[in-house]
Amino acid sequence: MNLEIVFQLTSLVLILAAGPLVVVLLSARGGNL
């Protein structure tokens, strides 16, 4: 596989995982929303 493709896939996965992760962290830090 091409290294650029692997890098783009990794970035995409990190971005998709960062969305729900930020929501969970904010809700956990702020308590009940």
UniProtKB/Swiss-Prot annotation:
GO biological process, one term: photosynthesis
Xref: Pfam families: PSII_Ycf12
Location in the cell: Plastid, Chloroplast thylakoid membrane
Transmembrane regions: 5-25
Signal peptide: none
Keywords: Chloroplast, Membrane, Photosynthesis, Photosystem II, Plastid, Thylakoid, Transmembrane, Transmembrane helix
UniProt-listed InterPro entries: PSII_Ycf12_core-subunit
Keyword hit for Cytoplasm: no
Membrane topology: Single-pass membrane protein
Protein's job: A core subunit of photosystem II (PSII), probably helps stabilize the reaction center.
Similarity annotation: Belongs to the Psb30/Ycf12 family.
Self-association state and partner proteins as the record states: PSII is composed of 1 copy each of membrane proteins PsbA, PsbB, PsbC, PsbD, PsbE, PsbF, PsbH, PsbI, PsbJ, PsbK, PsbL, PsbM, PsbT, PsbX, PsbY, PsbZ, Psb30/Ycf12, peripheral proteins of the oxygen-evolving complex and a large number of cofactors. It forms dimeric complexes.
Listed name of the protein: Photosystem II reaction center protein Psb30
Gene source species: Tetradesmus obliquus
Taxonomic lineage from the root: Eukaryota, Viridiplantae, Chlorophyta, core chlorophytes, Chlorophyceae
Gene assigned in the entry: psb30
